[in-house]
């Protein structure tokens, strides 16, 4: 037994070379690393959830849910089952689809370092917070899409929950165009991201964006944009440095909301010109939200994704005299002044914005200190994978801004629909994957970097308390979070291929045909000879 215990401790050390305080008290199952199965009580193949209120995006009902071998088999009242079934009592609680986070960056090399959360630690944190799938962004290797995909295949090998990939486009040539087609048809990628910021590294020009939009349209893939005017941001950064503003507040001052609004408007107009759907990631300002609202009102297919930090926080933290505190709030686009977050909440509750992500991109305080003397070198990113589901419930459902069905829609179902994996994901329906949470609306939570499951030693939601706690998480038919205990198995997560031509492409061909018929061109002209 002593030898077994020794190897168990060694395996934990290898998984977590830089553990946070919380990881020393949390159980991570390392059994079965080679074949993806374990024996720590997480692999029950039959589960009956009794007496809860089952909530989907379209309705809710009192019903039981029966799961076998990772699939929801039945959703109906008073299900009777035989022996060897794990029974969970959900009386007085909500039974919901597990959250799907459309926007994460795990094991990402960025700004001279790498995010502190890899796929295993980030996903473990997600499961503790009720998120059962995420979609991460693949960054090409020197512009090479295939090399980038292969690198992220390796990064994600230890995954403990299901995940998908978006792909970033950082340059353009015929090879990129061919690789996009291969990734869509053979690798299950149906979305491509274009950065309009980060001049000199990830940023693309308008001509490249236009080529990318055309290629996305032809492939049935969704074009996504990080919308900030990168040239103006670069100028703003120089201006701040010249003024002697080198701290985290300079980050916000150099990238004001107007630059996010301008880039959002530009991307929307170019997408309209090509007639292809557009997804705007991390909408942080009223300026950007207003542009999305105008486009949607006109009938354009534009998706707006706020992130939980932009909905909940404001930028006063960036002026904190303690660099360690201020720097942990640095992300791009920046967290905005008071008023923007509430406006984004209103837009989310009225359908102007469609779903909530996190942009989970974590660095510890040592990494953030890389920009101690120059805000331009502070690694951009905040946490959110573990906190999103709790914060949105407490902030928007408890306040009456959202119903329980709306909550499911913006945290799970709409993401599944947009990325064409519904109803496999995002639903409590017979035949859907058994990714399920049990949320107790009367239970409370408190957020702390000392107890969270991220490897980061900081948390931008430190000390927040609220109501509505995820008490049980089931991922792939396995109970992975229960009684405040996290039990996850490396290599138990699956890569989820996402097919092209989601519902957002419905009607595109017809509108193209209508456009062509409206041109009254080319005009047939009769050549007349001069007399």
Swiss-Prot record:
A family per Pfam: Amidohydro_1
GO CC terms in record: endomembrane system; endoplasmic reticulum; Golgi apparatus; plastid
Binding of Zn(2+) 2, residues: 193, 226, 282
Cofactor note (record): Binds 2 Zn(2+) ions per subunit.
Disulfide bond annotation, renumbered to this chain: none
Major location (coarse): endoplasmic reticulum
Compartment(s) where it occurs, according to its Swiss-Prot or TrEMBL record: Endoplasmic reticulum
EC number of the protein: 3.5.2.2
InterPro entries: Amidohydro-rel, Hydantoinase/dihydroPyrase, Metal-dep_hydrolase_composite, Metal_Hydrolase, Metallo-dep_Hydrolases_sf
PTM note: Carboxylation allows a single lysine to coordinate two zinc ions.
Record's catalysed reaction(s): 5,6-dihydrouracil + H2O = 3-(carbamoylamino)propanoate + H(+)
Record note on disruption phenotype: No visible phenotype, but unable to grow on uracil as sole nitrogen source.
GO molecular function: dihydropyrimidinase activity; metal ion binding
GO biological process, one term: cellular response to nitrogen levels
Chain sites annotated for binding substrate: 198, 332, 380
Pathway: Amino-acid biosynthesis; beta-alanine biosynthesis
Keywords in alphabetical order: Endoplasmic reticulum, Hydrolase, Metal-binding, Zinc
Induction: Up-regulated by nitrogen limitation.
Lineage top rank: taxon: Eukaryota
Record: residues binding Zn(2+) 1: 103, 105, 193, 359
Residue numbers carrying N6-carboxylysine: 193
Entry cofactors: Zn(2+)
Subunit structure: Homotetramer.
Function: Catalyzes the second step of the reductive pyrimidine degradation, the reversible hydrolytic ring opening of dihydropyrimidines. Can catalyze the ring opening of 5,6-dihydrouracil to N-carbamoyl-alanine and of 5,6-dihydrothymine to N-carbamoyl-amino isobutyrate. Involved in the recycling of nitrogen from nucleobases to general nitrogen metabolism.
Family: Belongs to the metallo-dependent hydrolases superfamily. Hydantoinase/dihydropyrimidinase family.
Protein name (database record): Dihydropyrimidinase
Species this protein is from: Arabidopsis thaliana (Mouse-ear cress)
Gene: PYD2
